[in-house]
Amino acid sequence: TAALRLRRGGARVTLVTKGVGGLQLGQGTVDVLGYTPGRVEKPYEAVKELASKHPEHPYAKIGVEAVREGIDFLREVTGDSYLLGDGETTINLPTAVGAIRPTALVPPSMIKGNLKDGDKVIVIGLAQYKDFHAGLIAQNIDRATLPGGGHASARAVVVDFEPREGEYDATGLSIARSLDNARTRRALAEGLKGFVNPGEIVALPAVLGIDNHSEVLADFTKILGAEVFEIASLPPCVPGMRLNNKLVVTAKNERVDYVLGSKVTGCKVTDGKVVSVTVGTVGAAKEIKADAVVLAGGGFESGALKLDSHGHLHETILDLPVTMPEGVKEEDLVHGDYWGSPQPLFQCGVEVDENMLVTYQGKPVHSNVYAAGGVIAGATRWQEKSGEGVALGSAIKAADAILSSVGAGAATRERN
């Protein structure tokens, strides 16, 4: 998001990433704020309230308008064929275990999973796809009280489907690739038709194509004569791959320089400003000059933040100072009540100002280093369901601040 925002603003952009990123591990949905700790029904309103009550939270610096702008920008980039929703109202979807989780934007293939009282669902599993447990999902949907009140009923059916002859332990991606083939998907849909009762909504694992997804969804809907939705399974998740592929292709088409599989190993600082970063490429290290840097490496899960064996915290890419929750010592970052109160460790990260410029104790660390996403301190993203909202809002603020200060200069976004 930061790279595309900068590129469309006229900057020359290099995107450096050690790996393919976490999007394809996700469900292809976009969270803004799901819990505070109670379930949220109006995400933007909840962001405002959270920001006013918790000044240490990233949303207090980002602000709801930047989050809204980030959501709108992402939808502009991807279009309605990838994401539906407006962030104003929560969309509630069944998970891979049948629990109902809140989110803000969803792929069109999932929107019918926003169940209401009285809905009847048939969950169809594929015997060769062992990461999708249709019976468990149906049982939990059947007994759940829906967020809007009432209940849906659900039952499960499991059928045989070999994406390739003799493939008895298939992945979601191999099934999705096989369903990109029109003959294969139509044969499967015809075979499922007899299981579906009139009025039932059909829930399938999120494997309805990777490159020809819209056509796959349309064929299943037409042949089954029913509303169809995907339920995300265990990562890596096909809807996340679709969204990741769309953004990468868009960035390349818009002439963002994309450096994949290379780690940033250091930077050169002159007069308090990072003037270049060093990237470990095959053969020799490469120096990339930069007028501004956006650090978007994620948190502990991606390796951008690290707690070493001595209990010391590190930011591993640019060696920026890491802040902890107020009043917490390093030895208390992880407590023994694992199923109780939040672990302070996950609120650690880099400190930023309202422009997402990285600071420490209120002063800029470098005059041109900004942060976006999970590396920013103050949010327990997985528990709040705030990850994408924080990432999008901070990316918008960082990119716009850079464009205001350096205009069409080169900006390097780094991920580790």
Regions picked out by a protein language model, each given a short descriptive name:
Residues 132-144, 179-198, 202, 208-267:
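Helical element adjacent to the flavin cofactor pocket in flavoenzyme catalytic cores
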